[in-house]
From Swiss-Prot:
Alphabetically ordered keywords of this record: Acyltransferase, Fatty acid biosynthesis, Fatty acid metabolism, Lipid biosynthesis, Lipid metabolism, Transferase
This protein's record includes keyword Lipid biosynthesis: yes
A Gene Ontology cellular-component term: cytosol
Active site (catalytic residues): S92, H201
Family statement drawn from the similarity comment of this UniProt entry: Belongs to the FabD family.
Record's protein name: Malonyl CoA-acyl carrier protein transacylase
One Gene Ontology molecular-function label: [acyl-carrier-protein] S-malonyltransferase activity
Enzyme class: transferase
KW Disulfide bond (keyword) present: no
Enzyme Commission (EC) number: 2.3.1.39
Gene designation: fabD
Source taxonomy: Bacteria, Pseudomonadati, Pseudomonadota, Gammaproteobacteria, Enterobacterales
GO biological process, one term: fatty acid biosynthetic process
Reactions this protein catalyses: holo-[ACP] + malonyl-CoA = malonyl-[ACP] + CoA
Signal peptide (UniProt feature, chain positions): none
Amino acid sequence: MTQFAFVFPGQGSQTVGMLADMAASYPIVEETFAEASAALGYDLWALTQQGPAEELNKTWQTQPALLTASVALYRVWQQQGGKAPAMMAGHSLGEYSALVCAGVIDFADAVRLVEMRGKFMQEAVPEGTGAMAAIIGLDDASIAKACEEAAEGQVVSPVNFNSPGQVVIAGHKEAVERAGAACKAAGAKRALPLPVSVPSHCALMKPAADKLAVELAKITFNAPTVPVVNNVDVKCETNGDAIRDALVRQLYNPVQWTKSVEYMAAQGVEHLYEVGPGKVLTGLTKRIVDTLTASALNEPSAMAAALEL
């Protein structure tokens, strides 16, 4: 049996109509969304299926929607007799999905928690003052140097190490623009502004992290049933306080996705299953470790094929 891990996507993977085919095949998908809707006080399934997209893309609605989609797919896997993965990891918000699936956090608690996380993130930075950009085709050290030089008293830093040659930067809008230009001058192929309202994982998120810490302290954390590799330290914590602390720091520190995938491969993982909408993490995998294979579990045919292995 191939050693496999489950990886859970973050914001950007949501689309109106996501998981419709899975819901038609597996009733547990809509049942999971009904649980989330009860926790939130509005119909989350209707939002994901009917939109409008600008509502689904509001971070405090995106986050519960993606978490619920991932948990629903994991429940399908479990219900159909799928084996437990060797490890789990989630990209940013996806870390919460991993922690729910590993039994660390109660699902309803997590749904409410990530809604608050979205609101705290939005409140931390006034609309229009923060930005993010993807830097393509430049090494990590050059990007860090460009950010340092472009800051000029403002905040800008690398925040998502997605794969070698694909790093996202975030901070104050003007500083991100200056850093993007500096990266291109240093040899980056592209500096692409991202359509987001919140500059995640940079120092501007510290006020949001302080509020999040208060909410995390109210929630029970259990020991994980499957090791979860965290974003911020690339470690598998088992202690509830250590997991909480990593989630707080995650909000204003970079997502170490490249190192997380390398770590899982070093532990003997050979295949990654992406448990959530889209195929963002599947696409990054080969660029990080070329011996790893990856596939997404968000279509009935893909789920059925994986369950047969």
